Amino acid sequence: MSKATLQRRPLVKKILDGADDNLLVIAGLGSPNWDITEAGDRPLNMPLWGGMGAPVGMGLGLAMAQPTKRVLVITGDGDMLMSMGALATVAAQGPDNLAICVLDNEKFGETGNQATHTSPRNNGPTDSGAGTDLSVIAKGCGIADSAMVRDQAEVAQLVKDLRMKKGPVFRVVKVMVEKLDFVMPPQDGAHLKDRFRQALLGSA
């Protein structure tokens, strides 16, 4: 079982504290959606309700289309495992305004907390994963600035890196398994797209 001590909601709140119009946020489905909404719903948040595996590719495209903006992708380990190939494309394109934060609780939280491949190998029936280290995979894909964060002492630097450091930046943050209330963003996908577009580009 993970020995993580970081709580995801306070962490995401710190990451997004003081977010302005320069910060564009893409959140993977499920818990990252609830996390960014708990921190404060805003038009320049784009929560992906059902797009498992999509946030990194979407974040890359947005970073390339909006090079003067900071693009932050916040997603989970299950989602990132589904779209690892996107990391090689991020490395190939090398956008300096893109940061990716994977909140890794070693579980598929939306389907019953089954172990993901990032959980330890042969550690009992609820944690029988492969010990996959997504930060090592990102580095192997060519993202040089890739690291794992485990401790509260590392959080202040994590926030600075995600918000300001030249990208692409990739961080895996080990977080606790918690049972948290859902804090729902708007559920209409067309509305989310339209308000994001208007906030970013203005009225057509």
Please state what every model-predicted region is:
Residues 1-2, 17:
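Helix-loop-helix hairpins and the membrane-proximal interhelical loops
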Residues 3, 7, 27-28:
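Short, contiguous, pocket-lining structural segments
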Residues 5-14, 35-194:
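Thiamine diphosphate
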Residues 12, 19-24:
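Extracellular glycan-recognition modules
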Residues 22-42:
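Acidic-glycine-rich active-site phosphate/pyrophosphate-binding loop
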Residues 198-199:
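A short, surface-exposed interaction/processing loop segment used at functional sites
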Residues 202-204:
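Charge-patterned, long linear interaction tracts outside catalytic cores
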